[in-house]
Amino acid sequence: MDATTINSLFLIGALLVAASILVSSLSSRLGIPILVIILAVGMVAGVDGGGIIFDNYATAYLVGNLALAVILLDGGLRTRVASFRVALWPALSLATVGVLITTVLTGMVAAWLFNLSVIQGLLIGAIVGSTDAAAVFSLLGGKGLNERVTASLEIESGSNDPMAVFLTVTLIGMLASGQTGLHWGLLGHLIQEFGIGSFIGLGGGWILLQLVNRINLAAGLYPILVIAGGLAIFALTNAIHGSGFLAVYLCGLVLGNRPIRSRHGILHMLDGMAWLAQIGMFLVLGLLVTPHDLLPIAIPALGLALWMILVARPLSVMVGLLPFKAFHGREKAFIAWVGLRGAVPIILAVFPLMAGLPNAQLYFNLAFFIVLVSLLLQGTSLPWMAKLLKVTVPPDPAPISRAALEVHVTSEWELFVYRLGAEKWCIGAALRELKMPEGTRIAALFRGQQLLHPSGSTTLEVGDLLCVIGHEHDLPALGKLFSQAPQRGLDLRFFGDFVLEGDARLGEVAALYGLKLDGIDPGMPLSQFIVQKNRGEPVVGDQIEWNGTIWTVAVMDGNKIQKVGVKFPEGTRPGPGLFL
């Protein structure tokens, strides 16, 4: 390869990445997932469009694995362990039982549609059986879903790859050797994948955390150390036959949930790297496919995709979540709909090609077609479906910017910046009148171009910029303090006419609003009553019906319900209440 060829590759690669970024601005306007647009750029530049011929499956496999490792590391860093209280076991059930059911149901129909053997059909089912972390993390961000739904989908997508990889590799081995039966040794291999992946991911994450916190480096080197460490854990786990995908996700989880040096620098760097990984991966996969090869299989492939989306996935979710009573029907329906397929099925479809199996190209084309249908149909309808099934909650007000204050190695202090508009509650109030969360301080106040020294008598005006020092756990309280007036209206429409304290006694609530207890202990706190009726760990947005009224969890403090909204039938708004 001469210098001219190398330079041409640099130019083409840079143009494709730049084109993907620029065209992605159409995503929000058209309502099309950004991943579909990037995939389309690759297809347009490929053999049937721009004429770029790319058929190196080994390179695609390399790029795909590298990209997924970075994406899962970033996803783990941003997942809060606190969300595990409501979603760990349901998500693991979906990641194992759910994938198995989807594989079997999809595989049987694939065998019938394409006149294949049962094992070949099951291989197709295994290839497309898992949801994709890149697609889920990308499309769920900023949608305002309740914690139970978001955590279930994110943990499932981060942990279901071992099952899909295990089934795919096992079925490829059976086809290559002519086997037709299953044996108990396969279960041990699956346990090995999960066990080794979990052990090395958690252990390696802890070791990497100690390195980051104990070694003094230039600030820009910490993110690189984290990425290098994550990739090393991914590769080592794969080398000893564990699940590298699970390991790198758990590594990120450990790093993201412990005090770590240069947290914001690491998160900002990983955010950019995750975007680059997604762009590179979907560009390569778009270049790899030959669009005209998809036309002959379009009708049966569409039928298979719709079967998986409308039948196989919902049934797998129904069975997988059967033991978990806290999930409402609308939450199960939404989780069933967001069975997003992305890069993982296409990468798994490369396995049969590299193994030289008959019909390998058919498997690849089918996987690509199903991913395309999934992203277009499920991805584009996600916001609409979330509203239809009522799984969204009013978003918490957020500062316009936030930055870390590295006052010591594992400092968790941050600087939050709020801009005060005319609709803010605190306009006209003196600073001494504000009930700030304990441990927070207003460090500076900007008015126009002028920096003011804030004192207790300083009166807030429209357009002021407030710089507040605090911790991440102070954000909800600060958000309420500096929230906009329209937010209060939204809260009341969602949570109800009044908001009560969670520790209010049922007897007092019943007397206040004229409700019947019907044998219920009057001394029971309202929060405990809701937990009993809900039959599971509560999250903001959970609702129960009692005495013809709707009671909604409005504010959580860790595992405890702090405030509860009550909504009365139209025309019946008795008694006083507390506004949120």
From Swiss-Prot:
TM spans (from-to)? 6-26, 34-54, 57-77, 86-106, 108-128, 162-182, 189-209, 217-237, 240-260, 279-299, 302-322, 334-354, 366-386
Q: Which GO terms describe its biological process?
A: cell volume homeostasis
Q: Ion transport: present as a keyword of the record?
A: yes
Ranges of residues in domain RCK C-terminal:
402-484
Instruction: Extract the HAMAP family matched here.
Output: NhaP2 (MF_01075)
Role, per record = K(+)/H(+) antiporter that extrudes potassium in exchange for external protons and maintains the internal concentration of potassium under toxic levels.
Q: Which family does it belong to?
A: Belongs to the monovalent cation:proton antiporter 1 (CPA1) transporter (TC 2.A.36) family. NhaP2 subfamily.
Annotated protein name in UniProt: K(+)/H(+) antiporter NhaP2
Recorded name of the encoding gene: nhaP2
